[in-house]
Amino acid sequence: LLADKQELEFLQAVAGRLPEDIDVMRALGDLYTRTGAYAEGLRVDERLSRLCAEDPLVWYNLSCSLALSDRADDALEALGRAVELGYDDYEWMKKDPDLSALHGDARFESILEWIYRTFEQTPDYDEL
């Protein structure tokens, strides 16, 4: 799509001028993945995981990029790290198409089960 190509050119230019800008890197990584440029998206996500080592969303996105690159073991390791850091969106993780290569893997199912037991079953005290 022309709009994606223009956005990509714009973000690449901005990233060239602001190579350490986390928000620009996030947007660029997302756009690479959305447009099927998985290797480029993976490079951005790997860099973000070094710069933002305690950010669960960074690790979740890295897991997605790894899964899209047919690196299931590494994807599951990154996903585990995301969960350790607090990523808990069970519903999205179940249906995220970027993680579809992990579906059916016992380790993925175990991570989902742990999130469900830990976060989804916790009473919402605001509603009590």
Question: What spans do the regions from the language model cover?
Answer:
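N-terminal leader/linker segments that initiate helical-solenoid repeat arrays
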Residues: 1-8, 15
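Alpha-helix initiation and capping sites
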Residues: 4-7, 21, 86, 105
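Alpha-helical adaptor scaffolds
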Residues: 10-70
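Boundary/linker segments of alpha-helical solenoid repeat arrays
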Residues: 23, 56-57, 85-95, 122-127
